[in-house]
């Protein structure tokens, strides 16, 4: 999911919010429990895999009022994955992007990076959220048609319609507890604890903040409906205390035919 910002101050707030909400995003949108025709034991196996990726995760620095300069320092001092040199791809092992900028890479005749090289490098930083010319949110599993617009609507309500109230809420949270909840959420889902409450509680509270934000935006369709209509699926999940992953696990236990299962 890609969202924009209108100033550095706006970016700082939005980036801190979305990183603080990563555990909630994992739990609320968990939908990758079945792996290789088996129950993986995780609500979001996809999130678990990304947590084990050396270039992924939720860096502590992301909670320290990350501004453009700090993110730039983070990105240029991040290891290279590969280098595209003409039509050839070379391993970037043992080099940082700052080495590239300093002309230290002998394998490419010490040439300096282009804007395309920078864009490629930024796209290989697999953190839960990342900055390009926009903010990219990466914590949500994909879902069916009935909830396809729920993720964009949920985050739009929070980040565009109710930014300050949400920022005030998450500013009270401890980053170490957020990171711990992030590590537990792929397996425990709504039962994960954060700041003394489970993620079901926080999901419900944040859904209300999002709903309020979408009402504040008052963007209407041709039928005079506002954007809160897209939150309906999430409201059902929270009311029933189950995730999309729970639904899939329940159906899977009754039907081993995955083709039929996904058709449903």
Regions found by a protein language model. Give the residues of each.
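Loop-rich catalytic cores of soluble enzymes, especially ATP-dependent carboxylate-amine ligases
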Residues: 2-130
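C-terminal amphipathic alpha-helical interaction region
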Residues: 210-264
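A structural signal for alpha-helix termini and helix-coil/disorder junctions
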Residues: 24, 28-31, 128, 161, ...
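Charged/polar, solvent-exposed surface patches and flexible loops
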Residues: 13, 20, 27, 73-77, ...
């Amino acid at each position: 999911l890609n969202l924009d910002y209108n100033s550095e101050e706006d970016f700082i707030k939005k980036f801190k919010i979305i990183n603080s909400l990563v555990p909630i995003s994992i739990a609320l949108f968990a939908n990758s429990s079945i792996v290789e025709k088996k129950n993986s034991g995780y609500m979001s196996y996809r999130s678990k895999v990304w947590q084990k990726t050396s270039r992924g995760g939720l860096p502590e620095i992301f909670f320290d009022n990350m501004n453009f300069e700090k993110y730039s320092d983070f990105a240029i001092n991040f290891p290279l994955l590969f280098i595209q040199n003409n039509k050839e791809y070379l391993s970037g092992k043992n080099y940082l992007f700052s080495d590239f900028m300093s002309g230290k890479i002998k394998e490419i005749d010490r040439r300096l990076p282009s804007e395309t090289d920078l864009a490629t490098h930024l796209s290989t930083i697999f953190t839960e959220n990342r900055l390009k010319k926009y903010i990219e949110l990466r914590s949500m599993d994909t879902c069916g048609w009935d909830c396809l617009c729920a993720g964009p609507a949920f985050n739009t309500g929070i980040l565009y319609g109710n930014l300050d109230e949400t920022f005030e809420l998450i500013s009270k949270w401890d980053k170490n507890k957020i990171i711990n909840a992030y590590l537990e959420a792929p397996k425990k889902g709504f039962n994960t604890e954060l700041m003394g409450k489970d993620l079901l509680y926080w999901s419900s509270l944040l859904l209300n903040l999002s709903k309020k934000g979408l009402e504040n935006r008052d963007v209407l369709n041709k039928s005079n409906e506002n954007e809160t209509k897209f939150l309906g699926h999430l409201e059902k999940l929270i009311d029933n205390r189950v995730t999309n992953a729970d639904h899939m696990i329940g159906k899977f236990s009754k039907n081993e035919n995955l083709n039929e299962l996904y058709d449903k």
